[in-house]
Amino acid sequence: MCIAAWTWQAHPAYGLLLLFNRDEFHSRPTRPAQWWAAAGEGEEILGGKDELGGGTWLGCTKGGKLAFLTNVREPSPRVGARSRGELPVRAGRVHWSMQLKLQRKQISTMVLILYWLMCVQEPWCTSLISQVLRLGQSFNGFLAAHDDAEVSLKQMVEELMTDTVKADRSVVPDTGVDPDWEYELSSIFIDTKKGQARYGTRSMAAIGVKLDGEVTFYEKSLASSLWNENVVQFEMEMAQ
């Protein structure tokens, strides 16, 4: 389970503000956010890297492309499915949507959000679970309190993405998985176990895109039981 919240052209200083928590088994090898080149891709990607699958869960480019994904829980995971993480990496390709349509049965179920940072249209969704609603309310409150000033991405992450409050069991959705496991996953920040394997929030990220094209990528990631901070800034390259 991952969770995201964003605001598009709703702040006087930012075109986009995005929050994202990635939840994964702690044993899965992962690199923190950095610039890296994926095989066969033209642009470098800024984002973390899943060393097992080779992809990412949240990535952006200097050319203004941004993509992230969240998983959809399935009672029986697909055997031999390709990694979802390759999708944000491939999102900028020509004819990519046709390739995805042809390969959709080979990839585990997920929700993929794509942004072209110089466009004016934003994605939307209608089915919101309790922790998403909770994060949305907290995010709106944070923005209302900082509507005339530059936003601290670190403060935004620490105040909003570390919330461990779980949903009331009466509103936990029925997704077909074990209800007790569903309950464990009902907070914004997750820290639990599945059998003997520790599972939970591995990284918390915030991206701020200012109106002048300055992009800041803030990440707080967990490695060897320690939380590490990482900040990358760059100027978005405008299309000629």
Can you say where each PLM-predicted feature lies in the sequence?
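N-terminal nucleophile
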Residues: 1-240
